């Protein structure tokens, strides 16, 4: 007894099996996490080190390079980049996908320990690391504002109480607090008052350090008691420092308040944060590479009431940005698309069968197959994301195909008068091999995807497995539940048609008759069809070469990031004004809901902005259209540029850039790099294929270069250390003492009062006390002159690097930009000492481009092997695969028509078409072979009869797949930019394939049959292999 006969005669067992599959799927669905895309984040670790006051070049040579040499030995590091700026170095390590982030972190700590002896002794702390990618957009931004508390106090609450608590939440990788710095006592010195009193800056520093100490004092005890000794050795507020005696002049006490202004302020006054034009402290939260964004955001939201309770009521804690609403909205759109696809597919079945009872059968088979897939997704550790749900949407057309083929064949026997159970057995027996061939060959398409490495392979694996599982369950259902329901539900008579549907039935009959007549003509003009087939192959090649290409569709996530790049010599005050101006322009745009931003720190001429757009339903423009509109307004702001880009769910690399794509220049000759980078950047800025061209090379910062006269210094009794200490004391925001509090430690910061450092003449007021106690002006032994200096020094590996970032103008693709850059580099004649290569997402695009054709060929070869094994033939698989060229032409023409570039999503569509369109040929070839074996028909008679008999199921399966994909094309709202390329590719390919393969497949079948007979050792045998 055949396998499926067991289920036909045991309906209860079959029903319970289907119920079990459905219940497991429902349970899996409830337990599946939610995400925008499959987990494709590279493991990234950021190492930070600081040496206050050190120049970028000093940080690069003395801090970055020793660390890089040690970190570069770690196994699994795929990319190492560093950026050194004033007083700080940051090294980004990107690891291979299969590298465990926790194991990598242990190796990073060991490498830091190994390099410790090579680092400068003056570093205030050891280098630290974080398991987060600083280039990723925050998953959530919290803001603190208050009308009563200062920015320093707000920063203290944020960094001391909120950030540590949030960091402990599962999934949180890093909490970056910006907008100010910790509270501090600031000592603003008056150089003239110091000179008048004969007090040096070192005297002030030493006096303050000696007056604020925290040392153990011991204890007193007798035979029965013990007394702990406690002194007032600490000064904690500006008021306590004000009367501090720092010197005696002619017997009179010189107090700190006599020569300085002492205030309760912050450690670094060159920091500013804002939200919607109001000063604010920002908590920018990033997730761990392996964390789920929705679960992490939900966990943070659940803790917000607790967090609010830990800070005073006068402080307002708000969510300024949250990535999760647009992700949820996108997934809801996909779920609605899935439901619409199921409804349309069932409608197609009903129109063709014109029987409510018969339609119930695939209407049951489809949900069982789709719902059952959720169980496998859970067991595989997948998530409900845009790609996995799109896989199920597309699977709707596939899973109904198997049921349609079985159902249609059984219905044909019923209409011929056969009894239901007998028809179920006979019909399933006839098409069982066909259904198996269709399903296995479709799954075979995805085998190369499962073996594909890198980011594309990780991204597509979840899609491929989800679809394959759905097809596998569909195969089981179509050979068990479907024939059982047919045998017990359908009647042995022609179904009654509703009057409304008779017209459709007559139209279908007329269409079939017309097809038969046209097929006869085609079979008599096979050479013309051969020319058409060869033409489609050539057209495929031309279209693939010419179509614009990109890595991944540009997403509208509802969030924009903006990088501010101002003149390299700009002051902090001017930069803060630019931030406010830019925020006002953006805040006034009707599509903008919220704006936050900050500037300052080690790179005064840069800033960041995070813009939340209104929900998609409340605005008519896409994110890119909004960027285009804002770009024109922002260009009118002098002295600085704001580069906007839409936040994407996929971002590769650890570089913090002001645009979406990067091109990196490397050289072992720093001078050559600095010479050629401006030339290359200016050339690229003229290209129409690129927009927002900018660079991270900043080597024209304003510098005042002091030249010591060492002979004069020796004669005057002054050493270089004393002179450098003078400059650090005066202008370096030097942290000279620590104030210990129960919750945190705060600094005493000393510098010349900003009122006396407004111009270069401030240097003339500086003096050093020599070893004879005399005040020697700085101008006696030093000269100064303005010069240029780098604001940052960047490395990749151990080579000097400069990264040029760019966005794409509307209507341009990444392939256009890549080709234009390659041409520009060739035209410029860049020397071999300067090497250029794409980085980040652009690099992955280049790698994917090189493997796309190989992947498609591998998929076709895999299908050929599977079909060859199933048919025990070298020839028939070629007949079946002859359907592919027309599908490729239709897909590529549709993409051109909709002005959609060929992306990774479109590649998925092409792979799916390889599996879909061959189903038509499989049904034709199977019936033709059966007719030749058992009907004693000639090959031409057999294929002609097969085409007519299978016309209805071919139309049904094609229209089911087409209508299953059509909602993807027509869908709007959040995430539509991901769904539409897939739908366009499939619909275009199906339409063109259906028009041509109904005629080309019979012709190819006859061609190979004649070829087989010609080379056969037994030419008299007329039966095919």
Curated annotation (Swiss-Prot):
**Which named protein is this?**
Multidrug resistance protein MdtC
Domain of life, per UniProt, equals Bacteria
- Note whether Acetylation occurs among the keywords: no
Q: Which Pfam families match?
A: ACR_tran (PF00873)
Q: How does it assemble?
A: Part of a tripartite efflux system composed of MdtA, MdtB and MdtC. MdtC forms a heteromultimer with MdtB.
Q: How does it sit in the membrane?
A: Multi-pass membrane protein
Upregulation: The mdtABC operon is transcriptionally activated by BaeR.
Which NCBIfam families does the annotation name? Answer: PRK10614.1, RND_permease_2
User: Where is the protein localized?
Assistant: Cell inner membrane
**Function (record text):** The MdtABC tripartite complex confers resistance against novobiocin and deoxycholate.
Which SUPFAM superfamilies has this protein been placed in?
Multidrug efflux transporter AcrB pore domain, PN1, PN2, PC1 and PC2 subdomains, Multidrug efflux transporter AcrB TolC docking domain, DN and DC subdomains, Multidrug efflux transporter AcrB transmembrane domain
- InterPro entries the UniProt entry points to: AcrB_DN_DC_subdom, Acrflvin-R, Multidrug-R_MdtC
Q: Key word Cell membrane present in the record? A: yes
* UniProt cross-references to PANTHER family, sorted A to Z: MULTIDRUG RESISTANCE PROTEIN MDTC, PTHR32063
Q: Which family does it belong to?
A: Belongs to the resistance-nodulation-cell division (RND) (TC 2.A.6) family. MdtC subfamily.
Bilayer-crossing residues are 3-23, 333-353, 360-380, 387-407, 431-451, 463-483, 528-548, 853-873, 875-895, 897-917, 953-973, 984-1004
What GO cellular-component annotations does this UniProt entry give? plasma membrane
Biological classification of the source:
Bacteria, Pseudomonadati, Pseudomonadota, Gammaproteobacteria, Enterobacterales
Supply the source organism for this entry: Escherichia coli O127:H6 (strain E2348/69 / EPEC)
Alphabetically ordered keywords of this record: Cell inner membrane, Cell membrane, Membrane, Transmembrane, Transmembrane helix, Transport
As one GO molecular function, the record gives: xenobiotic transmembrane transporter activity
């Amino acid at each position: 007894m055949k396998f499926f006969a067991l289920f036909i005669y045991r309906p209860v067992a079959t029903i319970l099996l289907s119920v079990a599959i459905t219940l497991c799927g429902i349970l899996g669905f409830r337990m599946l996490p939610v995400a925008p895309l499959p987990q494709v984040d590279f493991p990234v670790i950021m190492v930070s080190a600081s040496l206050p006051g050190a120049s970028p070049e000093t940080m690069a040579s003395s801090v970055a390079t020793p660390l890089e040499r040690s970190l570069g030995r770690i196994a699994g590091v795929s990319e190492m980049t560093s950026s050194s700026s004033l007083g700080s170095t940051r090294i980004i390590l990107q690891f291979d996908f299969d590298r465990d982030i926790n194991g990598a972190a242990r190796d990073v700590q060991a490498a830091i320990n190994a390099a410790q002896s090579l680092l400068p002794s003056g570093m205030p702390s050891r280098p630290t690391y974080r398991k987060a990618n600083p280039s990723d957009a925050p998953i959530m931004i919290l803001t603190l504002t208050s009308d009563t508390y200062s920015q320093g106090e707000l920063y203290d609450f944020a960094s001391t109480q909120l950030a540590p608590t949030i960091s402990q939440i599962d999934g949180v990788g890093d909490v970056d607090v910006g907008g100010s710095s910790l509270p501090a006592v600031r000592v603003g010195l008056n150089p003239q008052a110091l000179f008048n009193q004969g007090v040096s800056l070192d005297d002030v520093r030493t006096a303050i350090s000696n007056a604020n100490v925290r040392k153990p004092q011991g204890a007193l005890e007798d035979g029965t008691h013990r007394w702990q000794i406690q002194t007032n050795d600490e000064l904690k507020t500006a008021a306590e420092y004000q009367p501090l005696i720092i010197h005696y002049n002619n017997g009179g006490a010189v107090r700190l308040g006599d020569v300085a202004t002492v205030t309760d302020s912050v450690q670094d006054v060159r920091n500013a944060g804002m939200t919607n034009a109001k000063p604010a402290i920002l908590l920018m939260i990033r997730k761990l590479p392996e964390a789920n964004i929705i679960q992490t955001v939900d966990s943070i939201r659940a803790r917000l009431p607790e967090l609010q309770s830990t800070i005073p009521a006068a402080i307002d804690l708000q969510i300024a940005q949250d990535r999760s609403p647009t992700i949820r909205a996108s997934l809801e759109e996909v779920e609605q698309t899935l439901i619409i696809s199921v409804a349309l597919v069932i409608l197609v079945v009903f129109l063709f069968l014109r029987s409510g009872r018969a339609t119930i059968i695939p209407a049951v088979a489809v949900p069982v197959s789709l719902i059952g897939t959720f169980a496998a997704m859970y067991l595989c550790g997948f998530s409900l994301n845009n790609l996995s749900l799109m896989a199920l949407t597309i699977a709707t057309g596939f899973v109904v195909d198997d049921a349609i083929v079985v159902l249609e064949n059984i219905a044909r026997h019923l209409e011929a008068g056969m009894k239901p159970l007998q028809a179920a057995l006979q019909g399933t027996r006839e098409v069982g091999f066909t259904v198996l061939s269709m399903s296995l060959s479709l799954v075979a398409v995805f085998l190369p995807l499962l073996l594909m490495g890198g980011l594309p392979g990780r991204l597509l694996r979840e899609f491929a497995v989800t679809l394959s599982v759905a097809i596998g369950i569909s195969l089981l259902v179509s050979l068990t539940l479907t024939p059982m329901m047919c045998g017990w539900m359908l009647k042995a008579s022609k179904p009654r048609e509703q009057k409304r549907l008779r017209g459709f039935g007559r139209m279908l009959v007329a269409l079939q008759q017309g097809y038969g007549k046209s097929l006869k003509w085609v079979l008599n003009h096979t050479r013309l069809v051969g020319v058409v087939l060869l033409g489609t192959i050539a057209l495929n090649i031309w279209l693939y070469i010419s179509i614009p290409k990109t890595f991944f569709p540009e997403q509208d996530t509802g969030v924009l990031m903006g990088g501010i790049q101002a003149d390299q010599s700009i002051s902090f005050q001017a930069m803060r004004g630019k931030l406010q101006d830019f925020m006002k322009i953006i805040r006034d745009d009707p599509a903008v809901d919220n704006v936050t931003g900050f500037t300052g720190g080690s790179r005064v001429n840069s800033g960041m902005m995070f813009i939340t757009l209104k929900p998609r339903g409340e605005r008519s423009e896409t994110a890119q259209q909004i960027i285009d509109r804002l770009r024109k307004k922002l260009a009118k702001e002098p002295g600085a540029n704001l580069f906007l880009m839409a936040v994407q769910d996929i971002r590769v690399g650890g570089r913090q850039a002001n645009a979406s794509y990067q091109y990196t220049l490397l050289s072992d000759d720093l001078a050559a790099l600095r010479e050629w980078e401006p030339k290359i950047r200016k050339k690229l800025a003229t290209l129409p294929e690129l927009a927002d061209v900018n660079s991270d090379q900043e080597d024209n910062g304003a510098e005042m270069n002091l030249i010591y006269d060492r002979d004069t210094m020796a004669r005057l009794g002054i050493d270089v250390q004393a002179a450098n200490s003078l400059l650090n004391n005066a202008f370096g925001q030097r942290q000279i003492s620590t104030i210990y509090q129960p919750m945190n430690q705060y600094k005493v910061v000393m510098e010349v009062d900003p009122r006396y450092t407004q111009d270069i003449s401030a240097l003339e007021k500086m003096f050093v006390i020599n070893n004879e106690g005399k005040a020697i002006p700085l101008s006696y032994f030093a000269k100064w002159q303005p010069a240029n200096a780098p604001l940052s020094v960047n490395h990749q590996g151990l080579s000097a690097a400069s990264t040029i970032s760019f966005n794409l103008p509307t209507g341009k693709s990444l392939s256009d930009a890549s080709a234009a850059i390659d041409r520009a580099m060739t035209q410029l004649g860049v020397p071999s000492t300067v090497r250029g290569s794409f980085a980040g997402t652009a690099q992955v695009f280049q790698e994917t481009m090189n493997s796309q054709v190989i992947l498609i060929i591998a998929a076709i070869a895999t299908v050929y092997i599977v079909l060859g094994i199933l048919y025990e033939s070298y020839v028939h698989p070629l007949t079946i695969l002859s359907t592919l060229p027309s599908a490729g032409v239709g897909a590529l023409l549709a993409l051109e028509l909709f002005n959609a570039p060929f992306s990774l999503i479109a590649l998925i569509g092409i792979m799916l078409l390889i599996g879909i369109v061959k189903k038509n040929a499989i049904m034709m070839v199977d019936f033709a072979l059966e007719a030749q074996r058992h009907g004693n028909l000639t090959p031409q008679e057999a294929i002609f009869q097969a085409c007519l008999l299978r016309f209805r199921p071919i139309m049904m399966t094609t229209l089911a797949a087409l209508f299953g994909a059509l909602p993807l094309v027509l869908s709007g709202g959040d995430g539509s930019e991901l769904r539409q390329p897939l739908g366009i590719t499939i619909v275009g390919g199906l339409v063109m394939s259906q028009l041509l393969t109904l005629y080309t497949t019979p012709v190819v079948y006859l061609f190979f049959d004649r070829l087989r007979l010609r080379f056969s050792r037994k030419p008299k045998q007329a039966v095919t292999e």
